[in-house]
A protein has these predicted regions:
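Basic- and hydrophobic-enriched, low-structure N-terminal and domain-boundary segments
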Residues: 1-55, 62-74, 78-79, 84-106, ...
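Residues that cap or initiate secondary-structure elements
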Residues: 45-47, 58, 126-127, 260
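Alpha-helix N-cap/helix-initiation motif
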Residues: 53-64, 259-267
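P-loop NTPase motor domains
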Residues: 69-70, 75-77, 85-271
Length: 271
């Protein structure tokens, strides 16, 4: 009776991502797969939040890998953070062995090793710490904007307002702020030159103390890796939403194996 309930509960009419098989443990014998009864998640529900939890070695990373593989096979692009540096194995087809064969037999699943289309990214060209290179993820200061940048720099309301004035002036002059050097140069011009001070008066002044704080925080962000993160070419989110020629979703993996030394840079990226 319970098996029938499970079969009814997982009888989706819409496409679903398979995650396993149902093992019958109620008959009193050894757990055995029920023929024709697979467990899956409807693709339409996979944009919701989920938590994969478990003790060390219970398969959390492997579960995420299987989800990424299933989505890719269904033609859905995937973006994931590879904190431990072990998800790059998606690019290579797995080889069978006795342990895998035994597991397949016990769960009643069909399995064949296959590779998946994967592209590796890192933050601003930083070293992943695992000898893995990838395409740098960057953005320009202009696209990042003064509000988010103020948060990253830890500015108070007065300092944040001053930074917005700097962005406004640069925009009115048609100046693209590509990296932190550009921003520092504009702040320095507006606050430390007579010509710049005169122009700044037309939109509101910035005190020398406020400018000094902004410049110091910019220098600190540069030292923490921001110099590599801000620049061109800027990330286009559409690059993460692509499919391969065979119709499978491309898996974009952000390599973060060295995240412990990239805390400021990673928090900036999350903004």
């Amino acid at each position: 009776a319970y098996t029938a309930q499970v079969r009814s509960g997982y009888g989706f009419s819409s496409p679903a991502l398979p995650v396993g098989t149902y093992l019958d443990t109620l008959s009193g014998g050894e757990p055995a797969p029920v023929k024709g009864l697979s467990i899956g998640i409807p693709l339409g529900l996979l944009n919701r939040h989920a938590l994969v939890a478990g003790a060390t070695g219970t398969g959390k990373t492997r579960t995420l890998q299987l989800l990424a593989e299933g989505l890719s096979a269904a033609g859905v692009p995937v973006f994931l953070a590879d904190v431990k540096g072990d998800l790059t194995g998606l690019a290579e087809a797995g080889a069978s062995n006795d342990k895998i064969a035994s597991r397949i037999a016990s769960t009643g699943q069909d399995w064949k090793g296959q590779s998946f289309p994967i592209e590796l990214f890192n933050l601003g060209g930083s070293d992943s710490g695992a000898g893995i290179s990838g395409t740098p993820i960057r953005t320009t200061v202009t696209e990042f904007g003064p509000i988010l940048l103020s948060r990253v720099l830890g500015l108070n309301d007065t300092q944040a307002s001053a930074l917005q004035l700097v962005f406004h002036w640069a925009d009115s002059q048609g100046l693209a702020l590509l990296d932190l050097k550009d921003l520092r140069a504009v702040v320095d011009y507006l606050t430390n030159t007579e010509a710049g001070k005169e122009e700044l008066k037309t939109i509101g002044g910035v005190s020398a103390a406020t400018a000094g704080v902004i410049l110091r925080e910019i220098a600190a962000l540069e030292a923490a890796g921001g110099e590599a993160f801000f620049g061109e070419p800027a990330l286009d989110v559409r690059d993460l939403m692509r499919v391969s020629p065979d119709g499978r979703g491309i898996i974009s993996a952000l390599e973060l194996a060295d995240i412990q030394s990239q805390g400021t840079l990673f928090s900036t990226f999350l903004m």
